[in-house]
């Protein structure tokens, strides 16, 4: 009931939420079969409710979806991005980019986080620097790029009054 009410309230103010309710086992099974769901689950965090259940999910997900099939998870993440790049153009210098999905967009920052989780058990960029796969300068590029792209994306959403990820020529001129 809480979830239904919260989703309804979000819709009433114009927010679009993806949502579903699954058992722990069903969530793990879905994450093992759909990489898009699995990568969303990498970013899952406790907001409200049973903190113990959230921690049980996190541990089960890490063990059964990622660590238990590390090479496959890694390969599937990369393949999903390749498919998205092909769909949205292969150039990071597109004239009308999708700030979320085009090469060099927000998904590429997320990809670093997903692969970091896969190999090092964390999505935290600073922790990935500490553990070694990222250099401090790479961290700065990722953090600054994420901040810029997120700001642009949020601004476009607010201006459009809906989800808007394509940085059209008009949007480029407005934001310049």
Where does each model-flagged region fall?
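A nucleotide- and high-energy phosphate-metabolite-utilizing enzyme signature
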Residues: 1-176
């Amino acid at each position: 009931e809480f979830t239904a009410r919260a989703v309804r309230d979000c819709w009433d103010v114009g927010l679009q939420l993806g949502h579903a309710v699954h058992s722990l086992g069903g969530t793990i099974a879905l994450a093992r079969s759909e990489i898009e769901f699995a990568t969303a689950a990498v970013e899952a965090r406790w907001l409200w409710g049973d903190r113990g259940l959230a921690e049980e999910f996190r541990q089960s997900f890490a063990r059964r979806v990622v660590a238990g099939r590390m090479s496959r998870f890694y390969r599937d993440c990369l393949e999903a991005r390749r498919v998205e790049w092909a769909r949205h153009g292969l150039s990071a210098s597109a004239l009308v980019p999708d700030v979320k999905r085009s090469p060099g967009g927000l998904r590429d920052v997320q990809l670093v986080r997903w692969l970091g989780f896969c190999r090092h058990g964390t999505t935290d960029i600073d922790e990935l620097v500490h553990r070694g796969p990222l250099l401090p300068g790479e961290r700065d590029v990722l953090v600054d790029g994420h901040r810029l792209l997120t700001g642009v994306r949020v601004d476009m959403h607010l201006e459009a009054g809906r989800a808007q990820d394509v940085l059209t020529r008009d949007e480029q001129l407005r934001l310049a």
